[in-house]
Amino acid sequence: MTTTSAPDVYCVMGHPVEHSRSPWIHARFAELTGQRIAYTRRLVPLDGFARALADFAAAGGAGCNVTVPFKHDAARLATHASDRVRRAGAANTLSFRADGTVHAENTDGLGLVADIVVNAGVALAGRDVLLVGAGGAAAGVLAPLLDQAPRRITVANRTEARAQALVQAHADLAASRQVVLEALPIGQPGTGFDVVINATASSLAGGEVPVPDTVLREGTLAYDMMYGPAAQGFMDWARAHGAVPRDGLGMLVEQAAEAFAVWRGVRPPAAQVLQELRAQL
């Protein structure tokens, strides 16, 4: 008689979360790599992340992805954190170990860089980059962006003090990479950037693009970390000003591939899954 063990259980936690494509992506990764997992969405009350995390772990959960607005909470509640998590104060990937510890990683920036450099074919080395936002999404991508050695990264946020704090947390890394890293007011962040990355939820909330049109020039890569309809406003704005728009679908798949590798020890074929997912939209 043959017995089959239950699959390891994972989920994505957020608020909102119903739009997430992560369950399909991870199911496809598992199929292509021969892994047995179950992966679901979990809508978490805004004041209930710690309880949801504890309940999921107690029920035998193996790990979870964390999306807005809980990435800072995920970093704070973890037992162990990677260097990227410690710098950012934000985590998007949690692993629950048999000894009861929770390990935090942040794969957002790795996914963003892979999508820009590999999938979009845009080099970041020596470029001027504007990062719009200083919340968990922005914090999670700054170190991997610095690792690409751009000429300059400007962080612009509505609350300038938050941008300053994010810059300060990465000042040593910027110096070691010889990158100019600065925080400027969101209304006056500079002009003519090579790459503009929207790490705010302005598109998701239906709000206006929070930076002036002059941040763009002809051919600027304008990247919204959201995807699908949530990114449409930003992408329309970019296209209208001669920039090259790109949504965050590739980042989603690439960061998921990094998370899958953390959990399963296998790197799935992200490019294939991205192509398949793009065809569905």
Curated annotation (Swiss-Prot):
Belongs to the shikimate dehydrogenase family. Signal peptide: none annotated. The keyword Hydrolase does not apply. It comes from Paracidovorax citrulli (strain AAC00-1). Involved in the biosynthesis of the chorismate, which leads to the biosynthesis of aromatic amino acids. Catalyzes the reversible NADPH linked reduction of 3-dehydroshikimate (DHSA) to yield shikimate (SA). GO terms for molecular function: NADP binding; shikimate 3-dehydrogenase (NADP+) activity. One of its GO terms (biological process) is amino acid biosynthetic process. HAMAP family: Shikimate_DH_AroE. Pathway: Metabolic intermediate biosynthesis; chorismate biosynthesis; chorismate from D-erythrose 4-phosphate and phosphoenolpyruvate: step 4/7. InterPro entries: Aminoacid_DH-like_N_sf (IPR046346), NAD(P)-bd_dom_sf (IPR036291), SDH_C (IPR041121), Shikimate_DH (IPR011342), Shikimate_DH-bd_N (IPR013708), Shikimate_DH_fam (IPR022893), Shikm_DH/Glu-tRNA_Rdtase (IPR006151). Coiled coil: none annotated. It catalyses: shikimate + NADP(+) = 3-dehydroshikimate + NADPH + H(+). Its EC number is 1.1.1.25. The active site is at K71 (proton acceptor). This is Shikimate dehydrogenase (NADP(+)). The gene is aroE. NADP(+) binds at D83, G133, A134, G135, G136, A137, N157, R158, T159, E160, A161, R162, M225, G248. Homodimer. PANTHER family: BIFUNCTIONAL 3-DEHYDROQUINATE DEHYDRATASE_SHIKIMATE DEHYDROGENASE, CHLOROPLASTIC, SHIKIMATE DEHYDROGENASE. CDD domains: NAD_bind_Shikimate_DH. GO terms for cellular component: cytosol.
